[in-house]
A protein has these predicted regions:
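Flexible, acidic/Gly-rich N-terminal and inter-domain linker regions that tether
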Residues: 1-135
Length: 135
C-alpha cells in the first residue's frame, strides 16, 4: 500500500488518517501503475479520496464551502471512504495522535457542556461511545 497526498489540506492529518487503516504504507509522489494505493487530494473547494485495493477502485469527492476547515473535510472524506471500502471502523474514529482527555479539558475550558463534548467526539471524530467513556 502506498499513500499519495496532494493539495494544501493534504498533510499530517490526511496521512495519519490513511495510516489508521494501512499503518505500514509508504508515501509516494505519484499514482503507482500497479498495486494498492490511497490518495487524498484537496483543491480550493474540492476534496477527492481514491483507493485502489485488491484491484478495485473506490472514490469519494466532495465540494467544500469556503468556511469549512479544509483539512478536516479532506480527512472526513478519506476516513468515510476507507471505512466503507475496508468494512472497518477504528474505535477512536478519526482521532490521530491526539490525547482525547486534553481535547475534553480544552472544550470544557471554552465553556462547552458535557452533551456537546460527547456529540463532538461521536460525530466530528467518529469515536465510538465505548472509547468516549474511557476518555
Amino acid at each position: 500500500m502506498q499513500i499519495l497526498l496532494c493539495g494544501p489540506a493534504a498533510g499530517y492529518e490526511a496521512e495519519h488518517t490513511a495510516r489508521l487503516f494501512f499503518p505500514t504504507a509508504d508515501k509516494t509522489d505519484s499514482i503507482p501503475e500497479n498495486g494498492d494505493f490511497v490518495a487524498a487530494c484537496s483543491h480550493e473547494k474540492t476534496d477527492f479520496a481514491l483507493l485502489r485495493l485488491d484491484g478495485r477502485l473506490y472514490w469519494r469527492t466532495a465540494l467544500r464551502d469556503t468556511d469549512t476547515d479544509a483539512e478536516y473535510a479532506l480527512c472526513r472524506a478519506l476516513y468515510t471512504l476507507l471505512c466503507d471500502a475496508t468494512k472497518r471502523t477504528p474505535p477512536w474514529g478519526m482521532m490521530t495522535g491526539v490525547r482525547p482527555v486534553r481535547i475534553i479539558h480544552d472544550l470544557r475550558a471554552m465553556g462547552w457542556q458535557e452533551d456537546a463534548i460527547r456529540d463532538r467526539f461521536l460525530r466530528h471524530f467518529a469515536c465510538t461511545p465505548e472509547k468516549f467513556r474511557l476518555a
